[in-house]
Amino acid sequence: MSGLPTRKVASTYTSLNKHAFRVPVVPSNMKCSIDVKQAKLLSENDYFYIMHRFDIDNFEFVKLCNEENWKTISISIGVHDIDYQALENIFLNNLRLDFITIDVAHGHHSFVKQILEYICKFKTNETYVIAGNIATPQAAEDLVLWGADAIKVGIGQGYVCTTKDKTGFTMPMFTCIQDVAERCKVDIIADGGVRCNGDIAKAIAAGAKMVMCGGMFAGLIDSPSPVIKDPSNSSILYKEYYGSASARNKHTGTNIEGRSELIPMQHNTYLWKLNEIEQDLQSAISYAGGEDLESLSYIDIGWN
C-alpha cells in the first residue's frame, strides 16, 4: 500500500562510495553515448557517468577534470600497458580520481586480477573501482576478492552486442543480476538488456545499484553519435549506434562481437531523458508502496 501524498516526493537518489546521484542510471561507456562534453554536463548536474576508453588520453582527461574541479571524475581503462602507464601518471601526480572502471568483455580474467591488484597498491579510499563484465556469482566473488568495489554485470544482452549470436554465451539480464546479488553482497551495475524505462526498475528490483543504458542515450539529439540523413528524405535523421566490440569502433575486422545500426534520432536531450527516467522511477516506487528505490527490492516484478 502506498502512503505517498504524490509520486513527485519519491526519491530516486542512489549513491556509489561517497557520491550521491539523482537517478540510478549511467550512459554506456561507449563513444556513441558519452564524450567529454556530456561527461561534464552529467557531472555538473549530479548524474553518474563513465568516460569511455577509446582514443582518449586518460591522464590528460583526469588532469583537465582536476583543473576544472569536476564534481566527479570517472574513467574507463583496459588491461594493456597504456592503461598501466596512464594510472601510474595519475597516481604519481596525486590527481583526484573518483571512479575507475575496468572495462573488458570478459572480466573474470587473470589480466583483470593483475590490474586490480596494481590499482589497490596505489589508490586511496576515495577511489571507487568498478570491474566487469561478468555474469556469474563466482566471477563476482573473485573480482571482489581481487579488490573491486562494484561489479558490472551482463554478457551479450546489449542491443548492438552480438556475443550471444557469435559465441553462444549470454544470460538474461534479470536472472544474471539476481543470481549475483543473492550470493555476493556488492554494488552491481547492470549492463545490457534495457529497452525501456521500466526495465530500469526491474534491474533495481533484481539487485542492481546502477543501470547502464546505451541506445537510450545514443539516439538523443545531443549524443556524441554522428547525425546521418536518410538518403531518400533529408528531413529524416538517424544516429549511429555501435558497440565497443564492433568493427566501427575497433577499426579492424578481427574478433568482432558488435554491430553498427542506424536508429531514429530523438529530438530530446540527455537532461530531458534523465528527467523522464526520474519521473518513471518515481511512479515505480509509488506502485511498490515505498518512498525510495529500496522499496523496489522487496517486490516481485515480472517481465510482461
Identify the meaning behind each predicted range:
Residues 1-187, 215-217:
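Active-site entrance/lid segments in N-terminal catalytic domains of soluble metabolic enzymes
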Residues 1-2, 146, 168-190, 194-304:
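Alpha/beta catalytic cores of nucleotide-metabolism and tRNA/nucleoside-modifying enzymes
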